[in-house]
């Protein structure tokens, strides 16, 4: 499975959404790099990005197994933090459950909590800002993908979407994508009622996120006693593009809490 490593220090495993690739998380790399000594390990999940060639993928658990191999090979017995976006947030929760003694902190951006689309609590997509003349100028195929989840429909927002989100769709392995979606079972998901992860945790959700919403994240907060939970107005499923300053601030605080935790318990 493809990995891209940036920086040095404590490992920070970064897991993207479905069906994207690691580039969707690169807008956050600046704040990761400014918030301490972090070795950012970005992955491309099976069937996506530069891991599109992988075979033998059957369901969410197969994806999880591939990431666990990366943890074993790249991180070993060291402690590390995890940050997951969308589907990556669900994987991050499962990996935290599996590696709870080694995980220093869990961060999630617009996390998928419930795999079944029809069972999610999500708002209707209502754009907050729309530049109609700009949308009309887009290629119909680009406009169709963009407007499925966008709520800040401007040239500036689309340029970020076009740079960090859209390119992933051209490298998908449809067979693998379909295989992943065929079986959504994951260890530790949903979290057992008795399960608690006591280390610094972060939920960043979008008030206008019509893909995974924000209510389902709130409903599992009791499993994470040291979680900060943020619901951002003017943010959809690409909250880090829609409200970048707020998202950066929240991530910086989360990483500071992890650093303080390491010092207190070292």
What are these regions (language model features)?
Residues 93, 97, 105-136:
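Flexible "cap/lid" loop of the alpha/beta hydrolase fold
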Residues 36-83, 249:
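Active-site loop/oxyanion-hole signature of alpha/beta-hydrolase fold enzymes
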Residues 5-52:
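Conserved HGGG/HGGXW glycine-rich cap/lid loop of the alpha/beta-hydrolase fold
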Residues 119, 137-195:
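Conserved alpha/beta-hydrolase catalytic His-Asp/Glu region
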Residues 197, 203-205, 209:
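Short beta-strand/loop motif that positions the catalytic acidic residue
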Residues 235-248:
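Catalytic histidine-centered segment of alpha/beta-hydrolase-like enzymes
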Residues 210-216:
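Conserved alpha/beta-hydrolase "acid-adjacent" motif
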Residues 84-88, 92:
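Gly/Ala-rich beta-loop-alpha elbow adjacent to hydrolase catalytic centers
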